[in-house]
A protein has these predicted regions:
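Structural motif
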Residues: 61-76, 183-190
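Short glycine-/small-residue-rich Rossmann-like dinucleotide-binding loops
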Residues: 89, 200-203, 222-223
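Anion-binding alpha/beta catalytic cores of soluble intermediary-metabolism enzymes, centered on
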Residues: 2, 85-147
Length: 276
């Protein structure tokens, strides 16, 4: 089964638009970007289009690379928009973690600030899922897969993919092993018996079809560039042995963006309830 990420994303955005229609106003999402290049601008254009599909507006605040952390944090502190996202990566001179940690819980649709990450990790029902976790959840649901009791390997331990996905799978009853750079040489052995593999290493074609077992569920959340093309962590030939496979592009990416805007709806609709 090859997952059609665009189809799932379209369904999520349509449901989100329906939920938002009860508000009587159009939610606004602030996107902060520093020294955006052509690729960043292209990605922001896609996010803007998806925001429109979800019944929202994406307002982009562009800053030069001379901007300071204090200036970005001041913009976050004064933000009246419904949600705030910071387009990563930030220039190396800036402490991305400090900037992200300034985002209030009630506006953190990406779940990248400390307050939102801690709330998610604690299992707080009143917080939203990180978008990639939401994408993994939608993919498993679309394939009628319950991870409970399964052996899962998460490749990469970053806070965008690996850490939150591993946490979520454990909470769903899977036995989870995390592969990092130190264990890369042992990766074939780690993957050999895995029922589910979720990769977010950002290492082009790191995983080949001879490393995974027949019928494994393979979710590729890693992206990198190879030969001028966007590729995933998994060689496309992995689809030949997988029972479920997400291609790159067109798999996890579109679903994660849709989940981002579903999170905005979650935050906006929760605000009147006094949760925050």
């Amino acid at each position: 089964m090859i997952i059609d990420g665009k189809k799932i994303a379209t369904e999520i955005l349509a449901k989100t638009r329906m939920r938002i229609s009860t508000l009587g106003r159009t939610p606004v999402v602030l996107a902060i970007t520093v020294a955006p290049n052509a690729a960043t601008e292209s990605y922001l254009k896609i996010k803007s289009a998806r925001a429109h599909e979800a019944g929202m507006i994406l307002a982009v605040a562009r800053y030069p690379d001379s901007v300071t952390e204090e200036e970005l944090i001041a913009r976050i502190d004064s933000a009246t928009e419904d949600a705030i996202i910071v387009q990563l990566p930030l220039p190396a001179a800036l402490d991305a973690k400090r900037v992200l940690d300034a985002i209030p819980l009630k506006q953190d649709a990406d779940v990248l600030g400390k307050l939102a990450r801690d709330a998610f990790a604690s299992g707080d029902a009143n917080t939203c899922m990180p978008p990639v976790v939401g994408a993994v959840a939608h993919i498993l649901t679309s394939a009628s897969v319950d991870p409970r009791g399964m052996r899962a390997v998460v490749v990469g331990e970053g806070w965008l993919v690996g850490n939150p996905v591993a946490s979520w799978l454990r909470a769903r009853g899977a036995t989870v092993t995390v592969a990092n750079q130190e264990s890369e040489s042992m990766l074939p052995e780690m993957l050999a018996d895995a029922d589910v593999v979720v990769s977010g290493a950002g290492h082009a074609r790191l995983i080949t079809n001879d490393m995974v077992k027949e019928g494994a569920i393979l979710i590729d959340a890693g992206t990198s560039e190879s030969g001028g093309q966007l590729v995933g962590d998994m060689d496309p030939r992995c689809a030949e042995v997988a029972s479920v496979f997400t291609p790159v592009p067109g798999g996890v990416g579109p679903i994660a963006v849709a989940c981002l805007f579903a999170n905005v709806a979650w935050l906006v609709l929760l605000k009147p309830s006094g949760v925050y």
